[in-house]
Amino acid sequence: MTQITTMGVIIHPEPDILECKVKRALGTITTNKASGGDGIPVELFQILNDAVKVLHSVCLQIWKTQQWPQDWERSVFIPIPNKRNDKKCSNYRTIVLISHTSNIMLKILQARLQQYMNPELADVQAGLRKGRGTRDQIANIRWIIEKAREFQKNICFCFTDYAKAFDYVDHNKLWKILKEMGIPDHLACLLRNLYAGEEATVRTGHGTTDWFQIGKGARQGYILSPCLFNLYAEYIMRNAGLEEAQAGIKIAGRNINNLRYIDDTTLMAESEEELKSLLMKVKEESEKVGLKLTFRKRRSWCLVP
């Protein structure tokens, strides 16, 4: 049985990382990208003969101790103005620079997480699912519309997403969700320790700020963030009871009331009243875990035969 010490270190961890997994992860890192806070370009690892061996040793040490190097916990935020009016923070988008070496470890951790996450995610979630994407969901919506017309059914849609979804992820709730979803303690401990030591600095043309801690949100710029948010969103939809709800579009013996791509959700029903009922359930459960549906971007429309 898995045990955890009072310091949060796993006594009996998951199977060790293999060197071939490190080599594979390194090969997927994109070149010609800006370096993180450590200043090490990814191209350096491609010319060093023993790079894979050294990286494997470091990753294995992290795997065994669940403790991350400080440079791997740090991010550099670079704000880029989207509009001419650069007086408002909302008019900026942020580029996040992280260590390329940390990305290697994160890719390995992501692969392990996916093994446990995929069975937990509903079929209607297409985000970060192998062989699936936004095109599939668009095709599904078109198919549903065609079938609704064929069977002379009304159909109402509501397209929703969350206001700054990743920024408002509550860490304590996230760890609770990981446990409820059956994520092994070893992997959850690695994530908790990574987030506990998270630091960032903001770099502008005027200089760089001091390092500061971040206590909320899924880590910006990290490949794991969409995966973790998938579980966060799945928890919301389960508690909203969408799978058991009577509201939806009943086609081919199945009731369909939502399609998802990470934080983007399309709700659907045969009447405006049913659609509103679904929306209120999702809204209530979202607010319980700190997320708010964005009404600025929400769109809805109905089709009648």
Q: Where do the protein language model's features map onto the residues?
A:
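Conserved pre-motif C helix in the palm subdomain of viral-like polymerases
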Residues: S90-L121, F166, G215-E244
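Short helix-interrupting loop/turn segments at helix-coil junctions
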Residues: M1, N32-G37, T65-D71, D86-K88, ...
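Hydrophobic (often cysteine-bearing) scaffold residues that line and stabilize catalytic clefts
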Residues: L18, G37, P41-L44, L48-A51, ...
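Surface-exposed loop/turn segments and immediately adjacent short secondary-structure elements
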Residues: M1-S90, V96, H100-I104, L121
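Catalytic palm subdomain of template-directed nucleic-acid polymerases
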Residues: A165-M181, G217, L259-V289, L303-P305
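Short, conserved micro-motifs composed of acidic
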Residues: H12, H206, L293-P305
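Conserved catalytic palm subdomain of right-hand nucleotidyl-transferase polymerases, strongest
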Residues: N32-I40, F77, K87-L97, R135-K179
